[in-house]
């Protein structure tokens, strides 16, 4: 299957999977998915974009990896999704982020996800729980960026240059 067809399938799956899900800011959940997938600072390849579109499907919906594979999603994308899926009942957030740091594509998609989740302008009111979550997300972002700087310096430099750092 071509990369473009896989992207199209991923978008159809994500739209169906997140149908009728509304974020706290009132946006349909699919808007978050699209912002993550279109974050060109981090998400640079079609494989990463496909994973970004599907990044919350296995974790937050009834659809599993087997279903995605049956729909034509490649093993490369499924591997990234394996890293990105947080088993909240059995794995701490810290261990989940540590797992993500074992895969470059997962790190880049997660950075795009965290960037969107940290956009405080999307919330009507910021609670104490939100503030705590933002601290956790900032720490995760810092850890991932640190790993990028150490293990993938060229990619880190590219991101830093794009941000004017």
Predicted regions and their residues:
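Active-site helical microenvironments for divalent-metal-assisted chemistry
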Residues: 1-165
């Amino acid at each position: 299957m071509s990369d473009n067809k896989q992207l199209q399938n991923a978008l159809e799956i994500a739209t169906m999977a997140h149908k009728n899900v509304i974020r706290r800011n009132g946006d349909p959940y699919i808007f978050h998915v699209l912002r993550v997938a279109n974050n060109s600072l981090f998400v640079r390849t079609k494989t990463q974009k496909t994973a970004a579109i599907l990044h919350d499907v296995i974790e937050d919906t009834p659809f599993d990896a087997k279903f995605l594979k049956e729909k034509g999603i490649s093993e490369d994308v499924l591997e990234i999704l394996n890293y990105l899926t947080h088993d909240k009942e059995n794995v701490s957030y810290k261990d989940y982020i540590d797992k993500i740091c074992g895969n470059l594509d997962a790190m880049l998609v997660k950075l795009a996800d965290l960037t969107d989740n940290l956009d405080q302008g999307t919330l009507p009111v910021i609670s104490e729980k939100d503030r705590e979550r933002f601290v956790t997300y900032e720490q995760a972002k810092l850890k991932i960026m640190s790993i990028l700087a150490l293990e993938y310096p060229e990619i880190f430099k590219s991101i830093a240059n794009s941000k004017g750092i």
